[in-house]
């Protein structure tokens, strides 16, 4: 777990964004276990123009830097890569994202486990059925309260959560 005391005061606000099936699954074999174009559009619309922070496995599953966003990868083993800011410690986010109002944490599970307690908001695509998978979203309900359902469609909702005070 990351110690909140070590975060610099200049740290941008952290927001998390993730899609989760009803059984907490968020991934399978390095991919999303569902095909939901509306979720991909929501992700793009929400994160465009903002830095995104991810772990190495998440970056490797995407396979390339996402356009229109500063891509930051937190990894102790990944070498410097063109088009990315590779950092070794979460406190480096303040430096590489200097001037950013917020940074979106986009995964994976280990990064969510470490950083959800530090996030002020969570954008969750709730998928109203279980999926088989090998990556689960850690429990967050004790940290956040739902404040809005931004929109919904058949079998899914885009929910906004705020960290409990």
Residue map of PLM features:
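Short, low-complexity, intrinsically disordered N-terminal peptides in bacterial proteins
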Residues: 1-13, 164-165
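Flexible, gly/pro- and Lys/Arg-enriched active-site loops
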Residues: 14-51, 56-165
């Amino acid at each position: 777990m990351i110690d909140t005391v070590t975060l610099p005061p200049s740290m941008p606000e952290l927001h998390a964004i993730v899609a989760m099936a009803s059984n907490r699954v968020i991934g399978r074999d390095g991919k999303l276990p569902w095909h939901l174009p509306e979720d991909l559009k929501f992700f793009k619309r929400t994160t465009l123009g903002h830095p995104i922070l991810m772990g190495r496995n998440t970056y490797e599953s995407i396979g390339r830097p996402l356009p229109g966003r500063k891509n930051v990868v937190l990894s102790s083993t990944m070498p410097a890569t063109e088009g990315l800011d590779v950092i070794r410690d979460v406190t480096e986010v303040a430096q590489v994202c200097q001037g950013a109002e917020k940074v979106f944490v986009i995964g994976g599970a280990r990064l969510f486990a470490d950083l959800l307690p530090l996030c002020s908001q969570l954008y969750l695509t709730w998928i109203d059925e279980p999926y088989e998978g090998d990556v689960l979203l850690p429990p967050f309900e004790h940290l956040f309260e739902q404040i809005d359902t931004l929109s919904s469609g058949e079998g899914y909702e885009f929910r906004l959560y705020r960290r409990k005070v």
